[in-house]
């Protein structure tokens, strides 16, 4: 399906579920971006879930979002259980304004929901020649190191910086071996997941995606990944006023109340300390790319390069939609 046609359909669906035109557009743009960069677990596979949560009055389609200015560079946003895309859009835009005016910006958000890809928001800051660091927590999926029960979310860590070229450096990675969205997509399509990704509910390694969803995901690098997940839970949950310590509800399975996810957006001018930052980052990347390569490796890529190239390629083509997603779209449009 052509991107403009698909975007119109998504906007129409969100407006049907009482989102304003502006909020529907913000949400559609984020979903389309996820599809174009190949992050399908954060794309159209979640559209029905958002609509279900709106119809059950868990996501507030008409939120009264409040922004409290703590200082010239710091704000705290209460998203009033809005769809996560809208809360995150306001969060990053506010952080960008603070940084452009004062050199640095920090925005905490509470009472939000799943907002898609952190890198999508980091890229908005990078385009303004800002460095961005973004944290958000998620429903329990990963067991803390030494524990038998999942408590941490896949809690992504995101860092973005200008590179002096058109392709930004965007590191957007969950602290689990793979993100939960990929496992959900695999489960829905009856596909297997790689080994070493998850344990079933009995604590045994599994490649069955459905059993993985019933069990726990494994963190990257053992106790180090567990520590990173804990850090993100503190920064995005404890600090912001959002849910934390396993209290974020699963958006697909738990309709007992709002998620109250927290986000933290930190932005600052790339040339804050070194006026020639862009030249220095170019030198940094050039030096690393010149290193001897392993056999079969054509180019040493920096984080974000592959997704940028994939986005450009996919933008020229139609977005491929599975039969399951097509049924979701038809049902949501005709409901």
Locate predicted features.
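Active-site cofactor/substrate anionic-group-binding motifs, chiefly glycine-
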Residues: 43-99
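Generic N-terminal amphipathic, Lys/Arg-enriched alpha-helix
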Residues: 1-17, 264-266, 309-313
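Phosphate/diphosphate-binding glycine-rich loops and adjacent basic-rich segments that engage nucleotide
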Residues: 142-210
């Amino acid at each position: 399906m052509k991107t403009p046609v698909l975007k119109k359909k998504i906007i129409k669906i969100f407006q049907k579920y009482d989102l304003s035109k502006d909020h529907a557009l913000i949400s559609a743009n984020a979903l389309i971006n996820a599809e174009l960069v190949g992050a399908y677990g954060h794309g159209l596979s979640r559209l029905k879930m958002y609509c279900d949560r709106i119809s059950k009055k868990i996501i507030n389609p008409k939120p009264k979002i409040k922004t409290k200015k703590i200082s010239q560079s710091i704000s705290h946003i209460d998203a009033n259980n809005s769809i996560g895309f809208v809360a995150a859009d306001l969060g990053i835009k506010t952080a960008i304004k603070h940084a452009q005016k004062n050199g640095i910006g920090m925005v905490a958000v509470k009472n939000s929901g799943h907002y898609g890809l952190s890198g999508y928001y980091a890229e908005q800051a990078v385009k303004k020649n800002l460095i961005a660091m973004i944290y958000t927590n998620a429903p329990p999926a990963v067991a803390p190191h030494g524990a038998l029960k999942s408590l941490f979310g896949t809690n992504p860590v995101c860092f973005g910086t200008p590179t002096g070229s058109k392709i930004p450096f965007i590191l957007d990675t969950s602290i689990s071996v793979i993100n939960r969205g990929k496992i959900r997509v695999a489960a829905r399509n009856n596909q297997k997941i790689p080994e070493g990704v998850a344990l079933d509910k009995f604590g045994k390694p599994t490649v069955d995606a459905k059993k993985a969803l019933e069990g726990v995901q494994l963190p990257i690098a053992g106790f180090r990944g567990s520590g990173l997940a804990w850090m993100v839970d503190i920064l995005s949950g404890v600090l912001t006023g959002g849910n934390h310590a396993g209290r974020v509800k699963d958006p697909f399975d738990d309709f007992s109340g709002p998620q109250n996810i927290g986000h933290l957006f930190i932005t600052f001018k790339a040339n804050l300390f070194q006026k020639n930052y862009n030249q220095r980052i170019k030198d940094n990347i050039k030096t690393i790319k010149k290193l001897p390569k392993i056999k079969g490796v054509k180019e040493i890529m920096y984080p974000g390069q592959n997704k940028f190239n994939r986005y450009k390629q996919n933008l020229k083509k139609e977005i491929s939609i599975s039969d399951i997603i097509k049924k979701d779209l038809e049902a949501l449009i005709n409901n």
